[in-house]
């Protein structure tokens, strides 16, 4: 059994100095040591809580949350994390703030950052907008700190944008590491990141993109499966390919769910919207073309309905040769093993 000193020794062996006074936008922005440091701290905090050791780091301070899209699990996870470390959470509701009266991002960012140690932002609805907003927000905060308006520069944590969902994907990755007994046991394991039918049409691409962008860094054989037309961002696919080449695993694509499931050690069913359609939706909203948006929604719902057979079923699972698989169901945030 590990001790707290074991985790401290592990952290001392890693180089993560650049994370200080920096932000967490995407996992592929971080080095291997930096990702391992995050996993190590997470394990250390769990050890401390389970052994009744205080995890309080701050005597006071704020954790600011800004959710520009609906959230349950991430909202409560962020609040729980802040509480665990000694921060009080303040949630900024843009509809109830001066933003609704035309206040700029620069003004808002600096105002809410007084006494803040961390800012968590979710902005995942529109392609090309979410990550850009997070960057603009933190550029304003950085400038405010340099100009002496803010005594300190809070850190941003991406709570999901249009490109990546790092907090969820890293939580899933750490669970997989635990399940297989360590990072060293992941090489050669097959994970199928598969599209699955949902009656709604507009789910973000950031989860499948986050999964292929992170899990290809661990020597795993990562398969991205979806019906024709449900592609993700090509630049994230390129990142996944480069990760696989560098780390000895593989990254492949298929339009056959059963093929993706075959011999998989882990399957990750998740619905998402087609990248091209989400780009079009963003343009329609920018133009104020609500008739066009309504038409697009009907087209996408009809397109989704053609793929109801893309479902994680007992029948599909029974066709596979392996007797054990790890299922990650993000719709319910449950981890099931069969």
What are these regions (language model features)?
Residues 68-80, 177-283, 287-290:
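Glycine-rich phosphate/diphosphate-binding loop of Rossmann-like nucleotide-binding domains
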Residues 154-194, 324-338:
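Peripheral docking tails and interdomain loops at the edges
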Residues 103-107, 205-210, 284, 309-312:
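Charged helix-capping and loop-helix junction motifs
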Residues 128-130, 201-202, 276-277, 336-337:
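Glycine/Thr-rich phosphate-binding loops of Rossmann-like dinucleotide-binding domains
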């Amino acid at each position: 059994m590990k001790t707290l000193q074991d985790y401290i020794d592990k952290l001392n062996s890693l180089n993560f100095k650049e994370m200080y006074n920096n932000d967490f936008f995407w996992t592929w922005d971080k080095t291997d040591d930096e990702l391992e440091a995050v996993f190590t701290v997470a394990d250390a905090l769990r050890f401390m809580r389970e052994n009744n050791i205080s995890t309080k780091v701050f005597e006071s301070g704020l954790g600011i949350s800004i959710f520009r899209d609906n959230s349950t699990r991430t909202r409560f996870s962020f609040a729980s994390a802040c509480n665990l470390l000694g921060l009080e959470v303040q949630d900024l509701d843009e509809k109830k703030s001066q933003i609704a009266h035309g206040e700029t991002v620069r003004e808002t960012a600096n105002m809410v950052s007084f006494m803040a140690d961390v800012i968590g932002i979710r902005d995942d609805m529109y392609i090309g907008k979410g990550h850009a907003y997070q960057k603009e927000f933190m550029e304003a905060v950085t400038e405010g700190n340099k100009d002496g308006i803010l005594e300190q520069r809070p850190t941003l944590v991406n709570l999901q944008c249009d490109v990546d969902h790092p907090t969820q994907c890293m939580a899933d990755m750490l669970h997989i590491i635990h399940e297989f007994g360590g990072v060293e046991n992941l090489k050669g394991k097959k994970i199928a990141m598969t599209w699955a039918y949902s009656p709604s049409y507009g789910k973000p691409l950031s989860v499948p993109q986050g999964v292929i962008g992170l899990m290809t860094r661990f020597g795993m054989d990562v398969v991205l499966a979806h019906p024709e037309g449900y592609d993700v961002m090509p630049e994230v696919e390129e990142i996944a390919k480069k990760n696989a080449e560098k780390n000895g695993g593989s990254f492949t694509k298929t339009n056959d769910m059963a093929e993706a499931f075959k011999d998989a050690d882990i399957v990750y069913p998740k619905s998402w919207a087609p990248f091209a359609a989400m780009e079009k939706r963003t343009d329609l909203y920018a133009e104020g073309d609500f008739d066009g948006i309504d038409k697009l929604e009907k087209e996408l719902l009809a397109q989704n309905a053609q793929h109801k057979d893309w479902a994680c079923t007992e029948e599909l699972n029974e066709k596979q040769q392996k007797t054990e698989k790890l299922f990650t169901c993000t719709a319910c945030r449950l981890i099931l093993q069969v």
